[in-house]
Amino acid sequence: MRRMFGDCQVLSSMAAMAGASSSADALFASPLIPNPALAGFMSSSAAMPFHHFSNAAATLIPKEEGLMGGLHVAKDEEMDLEMDMELSGGSGSAHLDGLLSFADVDDDHKPQHSGHDQPPDAAQPSGAAGGNAKKKRYHRHTAHQIQQMEALFKECPHPDDKQRLKLSQELGLKPRQVKFWFQNRRTQMKAQQDRADNVILRAENENLKSDNFRLQAAIRNVVCPNCGHAAVLADMSYEEQQLRIENARLKDELDRLACIATRYGGGGGRQPVLSTSALSCISAPPPVLMPPLDLDMNVYSRHFAEQAPVMGCGDLIPPPVVPQHDGAAAYMGAMMAPVQEQDKQLVVDLAATAADQLARMCRAGEPLWVRQRGAEVMAVEEHARMFSWPVDGAKQGDGGAVARAEGTRDNAVVIMNSINLVDAFLDANKWMELFPSIVCKARTIQIINHGAASGHLGSGTLLLMQAEVQFLSPLVAAREVVFFRYCVHNADEGSWAIVDFPAEGFEEGLLQASVVRCRRRPSGCIIQDMPNGYSRVVWVEHMEMVGEEKPLQPVFRDYVASGAAFGATRWLSILQRQCERLASELARNIADLGVIRTPEARTNMMKLSQRMITTFCANISASGTQSWTALSDSTQDTIRVTTRKNTEPGQPSGVILTAVSTSWLPFTHQQVFELLADEQQRCQLEILSNGGSLHEVAHIANGSHPRNCISLLRINAASNSSQNVELLLQESSTHPDGGSLVVFATVDVDAIQVTMSGEDPSYIPLLPLGFAIFPATSPSPAAAPTISSSTTTTTGNGNGETSSTPPRNSSSNNNNADELLPPNGCLLTVGMQVLASAVPSAKLNLSSVTAINSHVCNAIHQITAALKGSAGGAGGEPASDQ
């Protein structure tokens, strides 16, 4: 009786533990974010999907609580299992099949258990429990059963009762066996994922410990460069530290003013009066520390009273409150200041020269500026005759290739005052947010002069900056440039000038070898305030390509050479759109539209959408950190594929596969934009809708055009239920001259609830897809493009020197209206992303690359077919904008 009672007690406890495990799976399950646009292309492929476990990890049987503890397999069965594993090919899923394939054949009076849910005494002889008890018999699931359950598990790790019942009937199993198999499979997957995360966290912890020890040792060995003694603060108070910092800052400011006074205020043979620190700078080599105004953009806090200038023995240890930047990186940046103290006055003189040239270029007309198809293009020879640069670089670039110049000018009215615009131009992070589709990277290397006496950046500010500008296609290389940015205020005219000029001789060691080398000639904008809070902006863009450029696809040769890809028109169109967007974000008289109830929820939704746009633009361009691969050797192939391993928040963790293609279409960019921005028309494209319809549940207007908006769409799919609703976040944006964007990403209901509640949405994972459309003339007026299964082929002249800027449909200057010919087509960039594997260390399967390539090609063909149908059978003839 005692033995039987003990057996019952063990069985009941195991049943309770199994129930707990099931509830834990329900609580802690983390399904991958679905992607409706690509939901069908992986499943339709004949290739096997990704396995999320490596061979080495799959052979380790995890120790599961409550489920694995009761599994006892006889020695002969273990040998059979090992032989089956060896014959299975060694894949991770095959090993898991071996672990999950045991099931018992019981009599009709006992419940069945599958795999790891067997009672602990199941393998004991029947005589130990009773004389007439039958001995349990175990068997493995068949290969077909395992394959079917694995297939369902990859689609739905948590099947409901109907799915389990249907599967059990198809496989000849009992529903309880299917239920237990799925429980064990989920438990093993969670254990493997936890183990991998634990290894990563341990490695990161060790790295942080080693960095901490190294920095502590470096602090203990710090030596003052002025006196050579150890720099120790001892028991110095916080107030004394601040006083020392302020005192050193004032000394340096006095030295700077003394240098300026000796240059411009003195005369004759009078000797300049210099302070002791200034004399030490002349007689001794420059110190290893950064000058006081030589601060990294990520370090300074817009108030220079908090920054550490020239430091003495007691000032080398930073104050207790450190700005948001890594201390070691700031210290290294201080030792590598490109512009030393003795060179600063030269840079200030160059800034004044560049500002004068910019003002003259903004006022000049012909022959400096000539109109070509509605755009103002610089006459390079006339510019060289009118303007000279004191530190002019050689006209011969790398390899003896002649530098090619691009110069354009445009003007526009934006809905933002000059103060806010100047503040955005002088802050690298705000500058990137203001131009998300063209500035992919930007940082301030050094602050030469802060300008304003109050400590804020303003008139007279002089910065050394580094930026990387992009075009939304991997077929056009990004351009990296190091330049000085100077801000000056003209009080008489009430205008501000933001002028950039080349950093000749100061960019050594700052440029990457993987991007196009450029020299930014005096360029920039003049901002004039208007009475109604608007600003009129005149923009001049002048870039010079140095060395031999990479060959471009025929579809881009004339477009890039004319300056349309990186010219003033594109910069101004993006500025107009972002100013409209920021103005709508600050508006508070917005009616309740959909599920967005509060202004805070509206602001959070716009921030989430802005991050989606920025992520999409960065992931489809040819920035210096991404390597793109062509799928064929044909020079006409326009599809490029890349992969990246992501572990940072904000995007799904794992291996992300991206495919991008750019094609020229014989339709206006507004026609293509209307097709792709309208969710109802887009649902007609089978490759993009996946058979489901969309219903708008929230709408945020953020521009003057009706299509400039953010939408939250409900995906009406057959898989939806009351507990599982798929949502789509979409933002569409258009400008008559600068082109259009349509970007969308799937989000779950929980993420939207977090956004609506006012919490930080920066950690919500987004994997955006979308389209970029730019107005462009045909690459070859004599030949129409043809679209093949994988690319758009064109015939161009190939000289790369003609100027065929896409004309402007609306301009403030209508004197040459007869030259404003409408564009006869557009450039369409299609960008697709898919989470290939949730494990960052997984290997990419070639079948997945083939599948996403086919998906992009089919999308282009369906878009072209839909546009031809809407044009009334006009074939490849472009439609008019009128």
From Swiss-Prot:
Gene3D superfamilies: 3.30.530.20, Homeodomain-like (1.10.10.60). Residues 340-584 form the START domain. Residues 134-193 bind DNA. Residues 200-263 form a coiled coil. Residues 133-143 have a biased composition (Basic residues). Keywords: Coiled coil, DNA-binding, Homeobox, Nucleus, Transcription, Transcription regulation. PROSITE patterns: HOMEOBOX_1, HOMEOBOX_2, START. InterPro entries: GLABRA2/ANL2/PDF2/ATML1-like (IPR042160), HD (IPR001356), Homeobox_CS (IPR017970), Homeodomain-like_sf (IPR009057), START-like_dom_sf (IPR023393), START_lipid-bd_dom (IPR002913). The keyword DNA-binding applies. GO terms for molecular function: DNA binding; DNA-binding transcription factor activity, RNA polymerase II-specific; lipid binding. Pfam families: Homeodomain, START. It is found in: Nucleus. Residues 107-119 have a biased composition (Basic and acidic residues). It comes from the Eukaryota. SMART domains: HOX, START. Residues 104-144, 782-820 are annotated as: Disordered. One of its GO terms (cellular component) is nucleus. Residues 782-816 have a biased composition (Low complexity). Probable transcription factor. Belongs to the HD-ZIP homeobox family. Class IV subfamily. This is Homeobox-leucine zipper protein ROC3. It comes from Oryza sativa subsp. indica (Rice).
